UniProtKB/Swiss-Prot annotation:
It comes from Haemophilus ducreyi (strain 35000HP / ATCC 700724). The keyword Nucleotide-binding applies. Substrate binds at residues 21-23, 36, 59-62, 114, 147. Its main location: cytoplasm. This is Phosphoglycerate kinase. One of its GO terms (biological process) is glycolytic process. It comes from the Bacteria. Gene3D superfamilies: Phosphoglycerate kinase, N-terminal domain. It catalyses: (2R)-3-phosphoglycerate + ATP = (2R)-3-phospho-glyceroyl phosphate + ADP. InterPro entries: Phosphoglycerate_kinase, Phosphoglycerate_kinase_N, Phosphoglycerate_kinase_sf. The keyword NADP does not apply.
Amino acid sequence: MSVKKMADLDLTGKRLFIRADLNVPVKEGKITSDARIRATIPTLKLALQKGAKVMVTSHLGRPTEGVFEEANSLQPVVDYLNASDLGVPVRLVRDYLDGVEVNQNEIVVLENVRINKGEKKNDAELAKKYAALCDIFVMDAFGTAHRAECSTYGIAEFAPIACAGPLLAAELEALGKALKEPQRPMLAIVGGSKVSTKLTVLDSLSKIADQLIVGGGIANIFIAAEGHNVGKSLYEADLIPEAKRLASTTHIPVPVDVRVGTEFSETATATEKLVSEVTADESIFDIGDKSAEELAHIIKSAKTIFWNGPVGVFEFANFRKGTEIISNAIAEATANGAFSIAGGGDTLAAIDLFGIADKISYISTGGGAFLEFVEGKVLPAVEILEKRANS
């Protein structure tokens, strides 16, 4: 990727407009998961170290454009940053479109960009106002790189300099390493509830990976495609022909045993059985021990591992063993030299639950952007940075 990088630029005295991803869950004014803020702090520290005048902004929630509501304010993020080890004061500015004073040794958080009229439609006039605030635009929000909005795309067209922040640069490098030039054997694990939302991903990965592993509702379709009864399990029957086509082009191991329950609840009893024994009133909520161990064996022999989605309903204690075995196998393979990359909300939750965050080579912060990159789609925010780097 030929883009300018913030880390390579002279930032002394320069006004920086950093578009970060600070879209964190907030409940009653309190942040319930700080992962995205923690990921952004090194970028802010680097900007301060390099003597920049730092402005940072993000979207948060889904506000109505032109309407300010406290529920969508970045104030909780400001409070978090002030309590962190940044070592400089952090202040929130709500009205900034006509200019904002920013000094070295402080951070100015510009209020939620989605409150500004024209943000989502990439209005050129709004983009020019953003660009006028800065000397350098830093795109560091990979999670929104697939959206051409004012704060992710438009500003990059008009800012004097447009570059990638450390997070975005690392993300593109890690994804490139896993997908463009993977060490082989390359393994892709795709789980989750709906196969229709991940069909293009499966299709793209089937052309790159030496082996595909499917889990969750996606695996149920492959089980059904082999002629087994999946009972009341979540699956999309109309996609069975597609599953058969994929299975004919790539080796996809189908579970031989599963854990079933008769209700979708935390207290449901888990029964382990062969896939051929699932009854009409049962639902598959996890893979069985034999299947999990077989998959763990495959994982441990891989040199590149791409992981998106759990293999069972790991949120329920009775149905998390499969995902736990898979998670630990990925951690072990990584410890033995494999390059592993993981992404997607459920995957990150599983990584946290099983305490393996420091045992995965790279954890992607982008959900939709992560999958669109895998599908081979052009990410608008990256495309404009490349264009500006070469103009």
